[in-house]
Design a protein with these regions (language model features):
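Extracellular loop and loop/strand-boundary signature of outer-membrane beta-barrel proteins
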Residues: 23-26, 61-68, 115-121, 152-157
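Gram-negative (and chloroplast) outer-membrane scaffold detector with strong preference
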Residues: 39-114, 172-175
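Predominantly the C-terminal beta-signal and adjacent terminal strand-loop region
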Residues: 57-59, 131-175
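A mid-sequence interfacial segment
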Residues: 10-11, 100-139
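Short glycine/proline- and aromatic-enriched beta-strand/turn motifs that initiate or cap beta-hairpins
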Residues: 7-59, 167, 171-175
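Residue-level detection of beta-strand scaffold positions
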Residues: 21, 33-35, 41, 49-51, ...
Length: 175
């Protein structure tokens, strides 16, 4: 007979998951600054994982008493390294790096503002990367809650390069 505990098999090489995530961009000072994304991830050795996904980010800039929106539509490919977990394999803390590419539009392509001012910012293709710190918590063997902090750096656009994101998500293990 064996003594001890048996744990569910989690984060095994080849396991894949589908993620839905969202949160705030540039802190929670404005609920108008947010993001939402969808991704597919797959585990490799030592609970590390690759990720491929898409994300929509909306950040508003104040001009007089109106908001001028900047929207980014990006695709992501990255790799996350697990550096901490509990013995029961319920909590995992990972750090990851991702390459990003996509399109940015300012004020949805409308160059004229309500007061006759003209925007100099242009719509553009953008590229860059992100560094992410992510906590995974297994609710069941197939449902995982996610919490993340992420810094994006995107070049090619007319506005700020860096964007900090705070978010939550859910991952469904599909095999």
């Amino acid at each position: 007979l064996f003594s001890g505990q048996a744990y569910a098999q989690r984060c095994l090489p080849g396991m894949k998951g589908v993620e839905l995530r969202g949160g705030f961009a540039e802190g929670s000072k404005s609920p108008l600054n947010h993001y939402a994304g969808f991704a597919v991830s797959g585990y490799t050795k030592k609970a590390n994982r690759w990720i491929v996904g898409a994300e929509y980010l909306l950040k508003n800039y104040e001009y007089r008493n109106v908001s001028v929106p900047r929207a980014q539509f990006t695709a992501e490919g990255g790799y996350y390294l697990k550096f901490l977990s509990d013995p029961s394999k319920t909590l995992f803390l990972s750090i990851g790096g991702s390459a990003l590419a996509g399109y940015e539009t300012v004020n949805w392509g409308n160059k004229m503002l309500y007061d006759g001012s003209k925007l100099l910012a242009k719509d553009a293709f953008i590229y860059g990367g992100a560094i992410t710190l992510e906590l995974e918590t297994y609710v069941t063997d197939r449902i995982v809650l996610l919490a993340s902090v992420r810094e994006r750096a995107m070049w090619g656009g007319s506005l700020s390069v860096f964007t900090m994101q705070f978010g939550l998500g859910v991952k469904f293990i599909i095999n």
